[in-house]
Amino acid sequence: MGFIDGKWAPMIVLIVSNMIAGMVNALVKKVLDGGINHMVIATYRLGISTLFLLPVAYFWERKTRPKLTLSISCQLFVSALFGASLMQYFYLLGLSYTSATLGSAFWAIMPSLTFVMALIFGFEKLSLKTKIGYGVVLGTLISLVGGLLLTMYQGIPLTNSPEQAANSNNHTGHENWIKGCFFLLTGVVLFSSWMLIQAKINVKYPCPYSSTVILSVFGTLQCALLSLIKTRHLEDWILRDELTIITVVIAGVVAQGMCTVGMSWCIKQQGPVVSSSFSPVVLMSATVFDFLILHREIYLGSVIGSVVVVIGLYIFLWSRSKQIVECKIMKLPTNTVEEEKEEEGRTNVNNGQLLVIPMTP
């Protein structure tokens, strides 16, 4: 009865969606270790998700979809550049140098990082005169410190892996770790930038699935062009390995397609803060699959950094939830249409209701 009346359904969807995201991270890492061009994976993934989401967007939004103008198309193209193609270029490149666990840990920094960028660009306002304001700042700082720990401190291995033992003290391996962390952080920064860009676009084109399809189309083309940076051989686009094919299909249909629909529904049902609070499930899932599937070592630095990031994330989310409630109580009506639009765009960022999820980690 609880599931039918919707009490537990969003929770189950959130847990399953985040578990799938962690599993896909581990599978993609396995495929990347095989030497495949990371942008080929991104291109196929976006292309497959486009085909999956196209009928969803057409039937669900055909009566509410506004006219797609040239201006909105150009803005969506730029949005896809930040949130899909360039983000995937750096994120997957970083994943190839590190691990699925580390990649998921960096993804958990994204809410705090987005908040900092929103402050810088004027999307967000913060008062340090209240305990809630201090909580937001504290959670943000703790998350960023956790990200710094993940980058700078690898630590000793906590597990024994014959495949990794030979390289555990390798200087080149440590350099790759630092390089990979830099690429992962760049990918997360790009995605945080996308959230601010997309918040403005959503005011003019408030159709989540249609926007996602358009972003995916642009992202597919952009990823295909970016793949030429690494190689221009046609045979690289032919997927022969069974695991690679399965990974690409799961990443496109399930992780990118079905999880996009599921996460969008959960945000509407439970709100963005509750939905974001389940993001550590991605980290736990990736760690389990990383160890069981890839047989990779788990390092002390990854564990400590991940714990710090999760603690900071929950402090941040708790403080933000209180701040959002406080803002709704104190909110005054705006006087002009321009002010209403500006406030709506700011609310999209503040509440996390960005409507579009172009690429899961």
From Swiss-Prot:
Keywords for the protein's UniProt record, in alphabetical order: Membrane, Repeat, Transmembrane, Transmembrane helix
Q: What is the lineage of its organism?
A: Eukaryota, Viridiplantae, Streptophyta, Embryophyta, Tracheophyta
What the entry lists under Pfam families is as follows: EamA
Compartments in which it is found = Membrane
Task: Please name the PANTHER family in this protein's record.
Answer: WAT1-RELATED PROTEIN
* Statement: the UniProt record of this protein carries the keyword Nuclease: no
Tell me the organism: Arabidopsis thaliana (Mouse-ear cress)
Span-the-membrane segments of this chain are: 8-28, 40-60, 76-96, 103-123, 132-152, 177-197, 209-229, 243-263, 273-293, 298-318
- What domain of life is recorded for the organism? Eukaryota
In this chain the EamA domain maps to 21-142, 194-317
Alphabetized InterPro entries for the sequence: EamA_dom, WAT1-related
An example of a GO molecular function for this protein is: transmembrane transporter activity
Q: Mind telling me what this protein is named?
A: WAT1-related protein At4g01450
* Family the entry assigns: Belongs to the drug/metabolite transporter (DMT) superfamily. Plant drug/metabolite exporter (P-DME) (TC 2.A.7.4) family.
What is the membrane topology noted in the UniProt record heading this document? Multi-pass membrane protein
